Amino acid sequence: MIKKKNSPADKYLIKSQIGSGSYGNTFKVTHKESGQVFCKKSIQVNNQENIEKVLEEGKILTVMDHVNVVKLNDSFFENGNYVIIMEFAENGDLFQKIENQKRSGKPFSDFEIMHYFCQLVIALNYIHSQNIIHRDIKPKNIVLSSSDSGSGSGSGSGSSNDSIPLLKIADFGVSKLMSETDLYANTTAGTPQYVSYEICNKKPYTNKTDIWSLGVVLYELMTLSLPFDGRKETVMRNIQTESTIFKPVNHPNEELSSLLFKLLNKNPESRFSTQQILEQVFIREFIENHMVDFYKRFNFSIDGIFKVISKKLNLAGLNLTKEEKDNLEHKFIFTKMQEMKDRMKAFDTNHINKNQQQQSPQKLENNNNNNNDNNNNNNNNNNNNNNNNNNNNNNNNNNNNNNNNNNNNNNDKNNNINNNVNYNVLKKVSVELGFNLDNYCYDTDGMLIELVRSKLEGKDRKTYSKCYNYLSNKQSAFTNTNNEY
């Protein structure tokens, strides 16, 4: 008997739940061996839409390497969910920071506003250089790390780097990875109070939509209020129709106040890019005078920040550096998930309802085109065809009974899996690979098979030759119903 290997999830101890959403939950966890604290994000992947989101977020986090962006530490499958382990920000988020300032009745100092804003510009400049649109920039998605690599955060009321936390942009769940030739997106995404004019009007948009959101965050830092607030419908209508998008900001920093008009400009073409923001003299002077040493505390250099950052990402197919290849073993999961998405698209066109007990169009076509061959098939192969066509003989009846028993045994947990895949054979494959298929629930055959594929990834071909032979190609993986394994 093959001993079941420990799950990657066993390495982490859940301390508390941080949040929840329509696609999954987030937890504060501790690595059992090192004691290091992480953020665990568990995402459901039980349909193709969720797979698309996980695939996109996975690609993005894999290539992200910036001190102002949350880092990916690990990723794996757990009970039908895809799990991302990220660094944990111990000081909450910018939303909580703003709320604390409101309660205290004290506005942020000019130094704090400039420092926070410049950190966000530097972070967005990097993100946009990777052809990524975040699409949900807001205080809740900006987390606060310590004010020093080895110390806690200060009170946040002074004019020194010692009191300034390191900001990190988080949550790439609705982010978009653009190609170098297609720079426009058109999917509605974001939070109403921070969403751009073009998205409100359902127009195609570029990464300039993030600049609008950045402008809203800057407005909030300067005034402790939002340029638009209220119910979703009211906010969207105001952004769509108002000629003056926000009230003048009564703030001593006139340069920042003027910059707001370049960020919250309804015309994306006239809206500043991150590079244009960095080119502003007062921004550049602040960064050079106050932020170089700040970043050195985190072993990060911003030399060359005023130049266009070269793209690390080859969008024709993620071109990872040697270090990334060595350190990010989980990158194979994203390749596998891309294959999963493609297979599911092909498979779902022939997907049939189990209760209908009908043969798929693909099989009917195969039967018509290969009738003579089918007549000569062995009894095991005939079994599945006869099952669908209700033509039974003694041998086929025995095999049909076996298949019916397998379906009944797994009906509770996998009631959406149809007869195109022999569940019993996949279960034997899973046992040989050291996990229990009954612990997983999937809506389609393609997803069930891809679970087995993911477990087989990297295994020795000689040792697991039967598994590889069974899952050798898409056709056999989706249509093989032979009981012999």
Curated annotation (Swiss-Prot):
The keyword Cell membrane does not apply. One of its GO terms (cellular component) is cytoplasm. InterPro entries: Kinase-like_dom_sf, NEK_Ser/Thr_kinase_NIMA, Prot_kinase_dom, Ser/Thr_kinase_AS. Residues 12-283 form the Protein kinase domain. It comes from the Eukaryota. GO terms for molecular function: ATP binding; protein serine kinase activity; protein serine/threonine kinase activity. The keyword Nucleotide-binding applies. One of its GO terms (biological process) is DNA damage response. Residues 366-419 have a biased composition (Low complexity). The active site is at D136. Keywords: ATP-binding, Kinase, Nucleotide-binding, Serine/threonine-protein kinase, Transferase. ATP binds at I18, G19, S20, G21, S22, Y23, G24, N25, T26, K41. Residues 354-365 have a biased composition (Polar residues). Belongs to the protein kinase superfamily. NEK Ser/Thr protein kinase family. NIMA subfamily. This is Probable serine/threonine-protein kinase nek1. It comes from Dictyostelium discoideum (Social amoeba). The lineage of its organism: Eukaryota, Amoebozoa, Evosea, Eumycetozoa, Dictyostelia.
